[in-house]
C-alpha cells in the first residue's frame, strides 16, 4: 500500500479575498449564521478559509472570469479539518438524519473527501452591481429531509427549476470549470451539491487528510466545543 503524501502547510493558501476579487464568508465560524444548518460553530470565531494552492489557483481564475461579467465569486468553505468533520457528524441535525451519514453520504466521516485536504471548495455568486446573490434554487448547504425520496433541489440532476436558476447554476459551473482548464486541472462538480467543486477522488486519495494538530496554532480552524 502506497503511503499518502502529507500536505505541507506552505501549500495551503489563505483565501482572503485577494483585494476584492472574490468574497470569503466563513459560514461555519458562526453558530447564528443563517446558512449554518448545524446549529453550532464548527470553526473558531476568527477562522479563515484555506485551500490547497492548486485549487486556490482555480478559484482565482474563476473569480476573474466572473468579475469580467459583473459577478463576484462568494467562497463559503474550503479546508475542513477532521475535527470539524467530526463535529458535523455529531450535530443535532446530523443525528436527526442518520441517513445523511450513509453512502451516498451528504456528511463525510472524518478524513474522507476533498474538504479535509483543502481540495474541495463551496462557492456561489452574487451580482456585483446590486449585491444580490444569484438565485440557485436553494441556499448553500440545503440538505433534503428525506434523502431516499429521490433527487432533491440542490442536486445537479434536479430539473424542476426555473430557467433563470438553471442559467445561474450553469454560469457558476462554467466559471469554475474554465478556471480549472486554465490551470491544467480537472474539477468534479459534486453531483449532490450545486455549490461544491473538488478534485476527483483518484487525486485527493493520494494525500493524507489534515487535522488541526497538523496546522500552526494561528491558522487552526476547528472550534473547541461540541455540537451535541
List each model region and its residues.
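Segments that shape or occlude catalytic/ligand-binding pockets
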Residues: 81
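Conserved metal-phosphate-binding beta-hairpin within the catalytic cores
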Residues: 197
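Active-site lining segments that contact anionic ligands and/or coordinate catalytic metals
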Residues: 194
Amino acid at each position: 500500500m502506497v503511503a499518502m503524501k502529507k500536505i505541507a502547510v506552505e501549500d495551503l493558501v489563505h483565501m482572503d479575498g485577494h483585494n476584492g476579487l472574490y468574497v470569503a464568508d466563513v459560514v461555519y465560524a458562526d453558530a447564528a449564521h443563517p446558512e449554518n444548518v448545524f446549529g453550532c460553530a464548527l470553526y473558531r470565531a476568527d477562522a479563515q478559509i484555506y485551500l490547497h494552492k492548486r485549487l486556490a489557483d482555480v478559484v482565482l481564475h474563476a473569480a476573474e472570469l466572473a468579475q469580467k461579467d459583473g459577478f463576484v465569486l462568494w467562497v463559503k468553505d474550503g479546508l475542513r479539518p477532521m475535527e470539524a468533520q467530526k463535529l458535523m457528524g455529531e450535530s443535532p441535525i446530523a443525528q436527526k438524519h442518520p441517513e445523511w451519514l450513509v453512502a451516498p453520504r451528504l456528511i463525510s466521516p472524518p478524513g474522507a473527501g476533498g474538504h479535509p485536504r483543502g481540495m474541495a471548495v463551496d462557492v456561489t455568486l452574487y451580482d456585483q452591481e446590486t449585491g444580490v446573490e444569484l438565485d440557485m434554487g436553494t441556499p448553500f448547504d440545503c440538505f433534503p429531509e428525506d434523502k431516499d425520496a429521490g433527487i432533491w433541489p440542490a442536486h445537479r440532476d434536479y430539473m424542476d427549476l426555473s430557467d433563470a436558476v438553471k442559467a445561474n447554476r450553469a454560469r457558476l459551473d462554467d466559471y469554475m470549470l474554465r478556471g480549472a482548464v486554465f490551470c491544467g486541472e480537472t474539477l468534479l462538480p459534486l453531483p449532490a451539491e450545486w455549490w461544491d467543486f473538488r478534485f476527483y477522488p483518484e487525486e485527493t486519495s493520494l494525500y493524507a487528510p489534515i487535522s488541526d494538530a497538523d496546522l500552526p496554532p494561528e491558522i487552526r480552524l476547528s472550534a473547541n466545543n461540541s455540537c451535541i
